[in-house]
Amino acid sequence: MIQIIYVASPESQQIHVWKLDSIYGLLELIQVIYTHGQAQPMAVHPNKRFLYVGIRPNFGITTYRIDQIGLLADHGTIGIFSSPTHLISDKKGAFLYCTSYRNNTVSVIPISMSGMLLDSPIQIIEGLLGCHSANIDKFKKLLWVPCLKENAIRLFNINSFGMLTSYDPSIIKINVGSGPRHMIFCDFDCYAYVINELTSTVDVIKYNNFQKIPSIVQTVSIIPKNISINRCWAADIHITPNGRWLYCTDRSINIISCLEISKKTKKLKFVGYQLTEEQPRGFAIDYQGKFLVVAGQKSNCISLYKIDSDNGTLTMLSRYSSGKGPMWVSIITLNCK
């Protein structure tokens, strides 16, 4: 079994492919590919055989086939009508959902049985102001779309054809001025965690199949009390697979914050932070919850950290140059024969 890290660097129009050496805490560069423009959001097909990459300024999505050792091969690009901000596949790998912060849209793009994207979206929903990401909960029935400029999360039903219709209620209101951006779901219970870009906070949302209206049960800051900050600029959020530790980045003070998730209530407690790369735009956690890889958009480097399973502390293991403006990080596990 091997772990592969993909890092998209739009300024150099590259994707760097790294292999994780979990014994020595090192990354080995195994491939650099040049993209058809500024590569930004990435999404991996559930079968781990395809990587989808959003491209700017000529808006498109490129499909890359992933071979048995993680190397990428270009399998074509489709044009789309909006600037891609975030991509996610449904759990069956039949549809790709693409949000556009700039164009305020969510597009639904069919994926063929062969893994290729069809020529154009089958549905485009407009008027989602500052929609930053698309997210599918554990029941696989709802698409959650944080809309930064609305201070809200829009909810959509996903039907059997992948199409979206408004859920009732169709919106979760977030605190004014928060700017919801990215989110993650707890795999062991019905809780969602939303990072707010403009206040550097995380909202904890309780939901389930029978509770019609999801509700915010906690809002917690990711900024340490001993650090003064002139501007909040939170970016990314992820949870370890065991559901115990939640990590967030803030680009204004270049930190990764660690919060502990209560086993009983699923609420958060701030436990510490790690100074990291300049402008930590994106990061990812491996499938065992042992390693974290973060990209510095301004430092042009990525750092590999070891996660302490007992207290959530991060320890830097190694650091590497990874093109210009690295933003997106994806980690996959492959069964290598």
From Swiss-Prot:
Pathway: Carbohydrate degradation; pentose phosphate pathway; D-ribulose 5-phosphate from D-glucose 6-phosphate (oxidative stage): step 2/3. GO terms for biological process: glucose metabolic process; pentose-phosphate shunt, oxidative branch. This is 6-phosphogluconolactonase. It is an enzyme of class 3 (hydrolase). Belongs to the cycloisomerase 2 family. Its EC number is 3.1.1.31. One of its GO terms (molecular function) is 6-phosphogluconolactonase activity. The gene is pgl. One of its GO terms (cellular component) is cytosol. It catalyses: 6-phospho-D-glucono-1,5-lactone + H2O = 6-phospho-D-gluconate + H(+). InterPro entries: 6-phosphogluconolactonase_YbhE, Cycloisomerase_2, Lactonase_7-beta_prop, N2O_reductase_N, WD40/YVTN_repeat-like_dom_sf. Gene3D superfamilies: YVTN repeat-like/Quinoprotein amine dehydrogenase (2.130.10.10). Keywords: Carbohydrate metabolism, Glucose metabolism, Hydrolase. Catalyzes the hydrolysis of 6-phosphogluconolactone to 6-phosphogluconate.
